[in-house]
Amino acid sequence: MDPFLVLLHSVSAGLSSSDLTQLKFLCQNHISKRKLELAQSGLDLFTVLLQQNELNAEHTALLRELLCSLRRKDLLLRLDDFERGAAGGAAPEDRDLRAAMEIICDNVGKDWRRLARHLGVSDVKIEAIEEKYPRNLAEQVRELLRVWKNSTRENAAVSCLVGALRGCQLNVVADLIEEDQRARALQSGSANPGSFTAWDSGSAAPGAS
């Protein structure tokens, strides 16, 4: 069975009746009133979002936003586990990028706005992130990286993140990423010392305005 569908079933089963009521309220801008009235479970709501292409295994931001609004950290952990599992089956470049993003999430904190500007994310989008997660610093950082990755698409690369980190003097975090990338390269047997030199050049990140 599709791992993402398994996740959605698990999340739905973990929702209380109160959670479902709140979820329907939060989905008013995404799902028609008629479909909301017919929904008897979280899975019913998720099915509509899947059909409308607002939710899938590659685009979990809406699900994360809903679970954050419900303050269901236990269900958010299930989503985190799914995303880590998906990363495990991704191409090496995607796994490296996800690993770098996790390091940023764990270490950047309140400096994320400075990083956002060096990544080319507009002030409008920065404000939107703050409004979306007003009291959740960790989710603000995650959302920044999702916005950046979605806007740069195939140009999203570890070197861009490291260059932006060094550009705003977050050198300790940049060093952590470089060390992790070297370890990952050695582990996979594809280490290439020259591949890391570009990270020190402070190359500009692709625009994400």
UniProtKB/Swiss-Prot annotation:
One of its GO terms (molecular function) is signaling adaptor activity. Coiled coil: none annotated. The gene is FADD. It comes from Bos taurus (Bovine). This is FAS-associated death domain protein. One of its GO terms (cellular component) is CD95 death-inducing signaling complex. Can self-associate. Component of the AIM2 PANoptosome complex, a multiprotein complex that drives inflammatory cell death (PANoptosis). Component of the death-induced signaling complex (DISC) composed of cell surface receptor FAS/CD95 or TNFRSF1A, adapter protein FADD and the CASP8 protease; recruitment of CASP8 to the complex is required for processing of CASP8 into the p18 and p10 subunits. Interacts (via death domain) with FAS (via death domain). Keywords: Apoptosis, Cytoplasm, Immunity, Innate immunity, Phosphoprotein. Phosphorylated.
